[in-house]
Amino acid sequence: MAISVAASSSMAVMVPRVPAVSTRCSAVPYLPPRSFGRSSFTVPLKLVSGNGLQKVELLKTRASSEETSSIDTNELITDLKEKWDGLENKSTVLIYGGGAIVAVWLSSIVVGAINSVPLLPKVMELVGLGYTGWFVYRYLLFKSSRKELAEDIESLKKKIAGSE
């Protein structure tokens, strides 16, 4: 008898109480069923309050009947083929491309090794933060230094393009 009284009293404690009147509101979005024939799509939002449910139109999008693509894949492939056929030293391009892939692979190995050392990643973060602060102070903080940076970038562009 004592066990049943203890069990019933513990069950009474474990059952949560729900207030009879809820005064809070919550927004619960739901997904409507898919309709393929519609030209517009509205996402309704149900607001739950003590008085009842209210529907609010949140977002309305319209589907376009024409399909436009900013990049045509056939045009891109033909353009790449024309540029590849126009190259004289194809082996040089392949060597540089392979070298770039190997360089990225090796740099990822080095970064992984640095991250495995316990204190070194934090030191590298501090070095990067210090360099960023120096760069902002040296080139971005004052108007004259921003002009100097723009001139340096333009001269570098000319050197790379071969017009200087």
From Swiss-Prot:
<feature type="topological domain" description="Stromal">
    <location>
        <begin position="138"/>
        <end position="164"/>
    </location>
</feature>
<keyword id="KW-0793">Thylakoid</keyword>
<dbReference type="InterPro" id="IPR033344">
    <property type="entry name" value="CURT1"/>
</dbReference>
<dbReference type="GO" id="GO:0009507">
    <property type="term" value="C:chloroplast"/>
</dbReference>
<comment type="similarity">
    <text>Belongs to the CURT family.</text>
</comment>
<keyword id="KW-0150">Chloroplast</keyword>
<keyword id="KW-0809">Transit peptide</keyword>
<dbReference type="GO" id="GO:0009535">
    <property type="term" value="C:chloroplast thylakoid membrane"/>
</dbReference>
<dbReference type="GO" id="GO:0009515">
    <property type="term" value="C:granal stacked thylakoid"/>
</dbReference>
<feature type="topological domain" description="Stromal">
    <location>
        <begin position="63"/>
        <end position="93"/>
    </location>
</feature>
<dbReference type="GO" id="GO:0097753">
    <property type="term" value="P:membrane bending"/>
</dbReference>
<feature type="topological domain" description="Lumenal">
    <location>
        <begin position="115"/>
        <end position="116"/>
    </location>
</feature>
<dbReference type="GO" id="GO:0009534">
    <property type="term" value="C:chloroplast thylakoid"/>
</dbReference>
<dbReference type="Pfam" id="PF14159">
    <property type="entry name" value="CAAD"/>
</dbReference>
<dbReference type="GO" id="GO:0009941">
    <property type="term" value="C:chloroplast envelope"/>
</dbReference>
<feature type="coiled-coil region">
    <location>
        <begin position="140"/>
        <end position="164"/>
    </location>
</feature>
<dbReference type="GO" id="GO:0090391">
    <property type="term" value="P:granum assembly"/>
</dbReference>
<feature type="transmembrane region" description="Helical">
    <location>
        <begin position="94"/>
        <end position="114"/>
    </location>
</feature>
<keyword id="KW-0007">Acetylation</keyword>
<dbReference type="GO" id="GO:0010287">
    <property type="term" value="C:plastoglobule"/>
</dbReference>
<comment type="function">
    <text>Determines thylakoid architecture by inducing membrane curvature.</text>
</comment>
<feature type="modified residue" description="N-acetylalanine">
    <location>
        <position position="63"/>
    </location>
</feature>
<keyword id="KW-0934">Plastid</keyword>
<dbReference type="GO" id="GO:0005829">
    <property type="term" value="C:cytosol"/>
</dbReference>
<keyword id="KW-0812">Transmembrane</keyword>
<keyword id="KW-0472">Membrane</keyword>
<dbReference type="InterPro" id="IPR025564">
    <property type="entry name" value="CAAD_dom"/>
</dbReference>
<protein>
    <recommendedName>
        <fullName>Protein CURVATURE THYLAKOID 1A, chloroplastic</fullName>
    </recommendedName>
</protein>
<feature type="transit peptide" description="Chloroplast">
    <location>
        <begin position="1"/>
        <end position="62"/>
    </location>
</feature>
<keyword id="KW-1133">Transmembrane helix</keyword>
<feature type="transmembrane region" description="Helical">
    <location>
        <begin position="117"/>
        <end position="137"/>
    </location>
</feature>
<dbReference type="GO" id="GO:0009579">
    <property type="term" value="C:thylakoid"/>
</dbReference>
<keyword id="KW-0175">Coiled coil</keyword>
<comment type="subunit">
    <text>Homo- and heterodimers and trimers.</text>
</comment>
